Amino acid sequence: MNNFILLEEQLIKKSQQKRRTSPSNFKVRFFVLTKASLAYFEDRHGKKRTLKGSIELSRIKCVEIVKSDISIPCHYKYPFQVVHDNYLLYVFAPDRESRQRWVLALKEETRNNNSLVPKYHPNFWMDGKWRCCSQLEKLATGCAQYDPTKNASKKPLPPTPEDNRRPLWEPEETVVIALYDYQTNDPQELALRRNEEYCLLDSSEIHWWRVQDRNGHEGYVPSSYLVEKSPNNLETYEWYNKSISRDKAEKLLLDTGKEGAFMVRDSRTAGTYTVSVFTKAVVSENNPCIKHYHIKETNDNPKRYYVAEKYVFDSIPLLINYHQHNGGGLVTRLRYPVCFGRQKAPVTAGLRYGKWVIDPSELTFVQEIGSGQFGLVHLGYWLNKDKVAIKTIREGAMSEEDFIEEAEVMMKLSHPKLVQLYGVCLEQAPICLVFEFMEHGCLSDYLRTQRGLFAAETLLGMCLDVCEGMAYLEEACVIHRDLAARNCLVGENQVIKVSDFGMTRFVLDDQYTSSTGTKFPVKWASPEVFSFSRYSSKSDVWSFGVLMWEVFSEGKIPYENRSNSEVVEDISTGFRLYKPRLASTHVYQIMNHCWKERPEDRPAFSRLLRQLAEIAESGL
């Protein structure tokens, strides 16, 4: 009876890494579930199956699906976990139904075990910590309640003959909420309605997720339009601003002029938050101010939250709700939520799912707005509705074959502080590159035309924007090679985005690519670049220091009247740019750290981002 086979199927397992030196790999195995054990075999064609491992069902402590937003590194994308003894087995099923069958069957057979855990970890153990709760011990107590009876003894109903769509979502499935509307006529995609809930079916692609609506319709949608439904996820609330500097927060609140206008924003310490509120009560009616309150956490498990010690709450939304109705120790009641950037949907990685080659007939050219290394830039529209920037590539200006090989990869680089490449037109000469349109043009021109109007805090915010984009490229192992204010663009609300990353690889003009060429940007180049053409993320850091200098000098040319050869000689003898008038001592110190002689002595962009955020939060 104990050998009766309940389920059998080919699945993929991740190594359990029972020893510290064990490799982390994935193996295809033939799994067999009986009343006594869960066994897995190596299944080689034409040969007898070889038993590779077996777990007694009586030793199982937990069986549950794994909810995660990471890209699954094997071709089966539906993970579940089997916790037994002191080990953790991750198994990957080919589809949702297969995973459901295995989890239900295993739960049914183990729900009366004596060793079941009260709590489990719903996300992966990766890189030395739990992704769900950031605990650093692999055997740490879980962070979510485990219910061994949930869905056990319950089989999903088959679809009715006239309706083959999926049934409504199972409780274990990840539910996401749309932050924005999304309209589409593409049969592969699904339209989104703001604040509606959807079931996440597949998140293996970073920028486009497959979801299901409440009517059972499925399709791909931009992942940046969605947020996971969770009591502690703040992104669905109109008062939350994820990435905004203290200076920008103060400007927005002052612009409202309303007593009690407020927002919740990320603090400089990851995972902590600040409430910023406008008031006229502290100083005078004619001299209002912004008060900042750090949201503090108790040492309880689970944590609780407070601003004033007398009023402690189980979640941040509950805390905000209370203070919207009661002052409770704050200078004023939280009356008017202020949100930055939520009115406009974020750009997507590609104009449509899987679409990176654009038909020229879909583009309308409106007017020429500039020229660059590759050719002319036009304002235009895609399908007469989406405003875009169209770069027409001059014949002989770039290595087109090399670029086309890289274009699809470059399109997948997507971040709020990068100018998005939407696609390319290849069907006619010259080829065109279609980019996100940025309202106010390049940063260097913007700084010069507005010179004398900038506060130092605003300039620091510009540097922070660029640093955010560069930290993303650094993590993605992408080298810009030509970072400068001329290659950053200014959008609405003075948001700065990095443009033309990696494009110099495709330039054919030797005067631009050779360090001896008259067009080579020596004034932004590190010593190892102009001496040996050695590009790296650390050579980008040097260029970022020069860009900071450009920003705080409001668009001046670095080294001003010096020739390229004189600049090379100056830098080689230890000369560095002077401190701009608007740069504080702390800001200038960061510039000098970027200009260290040896690349390894320069900070990473991730570190620069933390340092600049600290200065922005504490004041220049």
Curated annotation (Swiss-Prot):
Which top EC class is named for this enzyme in its record? transferase
Its tissue distribution reads: T-cell lines and natural killer cell lines.
Q: Which residues form the SH3 domain?
A: 171-231
Residues with Phosphotyrosine modification: 180, 512
Disulphides = none
- Annotated ATP binding lies at 369-377, 391
SH2 domain location: 239-338
- Looking at the record, which disorder is this protein connected with? Lymphoproliferative syndrome 1: A rare immunodeficiency characterized by extreme susceptibility to infection with Epstein-Barr virus (EBV). Inadequate immune response to EBV can have a fatal outcome. Clinical features include splenomegaly, lymphadenopathy, anemia, thrombocytopenia, pancytopenia, recurrent infections. There is an increased risk for lymphoma.
Similarity comment text for this entry: Belongs to the protein kinase superfamily. Tyr protein kinase family. TEC subfamily.
Domain-related comment: The N-terminal PH domain allows ITK to be recruited to the plasma membrane by an activated PI3 kinase. This domain also contains a proline-rich region (PRR). The adjoining domain is a SH3 domain, which binds to PRR (from itself or from other proteins). Next, a SH2 domain is required for binding tyrosine-phosphorylated substrates. In the C-terminal region, the kinase domain is required for tyrosine phosphorylation.
Query: What the protein does?
Result: Tyrosine kinase that plays an essential role in regulation of the adaptive immune response. Regulates the development, function and differentiation of conventional T-cells and nonconventional NKT-cells. When antigen presenting cells (APC) activate T-cell receptor (TCR), a series of phosphorylation lead to the recruitment of ITK to the cell membrane, in the vicinity of the stimulated TCR receptor, where it is phosphorylated by LCK. Phosphorylation leads to ITK autophosphorylation and full activation.
Q: Name the chain's protein.
A: Tyrosine-protein kinase ITK/TSK
- Say which species the protein is native to: Homo sapiens (Human)
Gene it is expressed from: ITK
